[in-house]
Amino acid sequence: MKKAFYLLALLAVFTISCTPQKPNPENQTVMKPEKNDDGEWDIDVIDTQYDYFLNAIAKPVSMYTESYLKTRNQFLVSEWNSYYYSGRYRNVIESAIDYDPNENYGLKFEYKLYQVFAYVHWKYGLRMQGLSATDRR
């Protein structure tokens, strides 16, 4: 009888420990755009290959308009955050993005944010539906 009890207790502990854990809202990180010392919005990507991607692979900023990038970024940020909050691609997406579509970030910021999504697709193969076909390489 004792053995059966211990076996059931061990089985219960094992079952409880194997259930998927929901992300704790207190531990979630959110990337929030901030202004730099010059009062302009800026993004800092801490990946050495990102600079290479911007200079050698990404289309130049002159190929885009600010309104085009703003529209794409709204969709891409929504897609990114849905991946983050669902727990998919946790090894790639480590934080949510706090993006306000009513804020005027400027062309440079919108371009760099869009290229972050293109870079993640290029480097990790993450499917981002909001990218244009020419930016999916």
Which residues make up each language-model segment?
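Sec-dependent signal peptide recognition
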Residues: K2-L8
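C-terminal motif of bacterial Sec signal peptides marking the signal peptidase cleavage site
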Residues: F14-S17
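Bacterial signal peptide processing site
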Residues: T19-K22
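Juxtamembrane extracytosolic/periplasmic "stalk" immediately C-terminal to the first targeting helix
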Residues: Q28-V30
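Low-complexity, intrinsically disordered regions in eukaryotic regulatory proteins
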Residues: K32-Y68, A96-D100
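Mature extracytoplasmic domains of secretory-pathway proteins
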Residues: P60-Y89
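Compact alpha-helical subdomains of small soluble proteins
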Residues: F75, Y83-R137
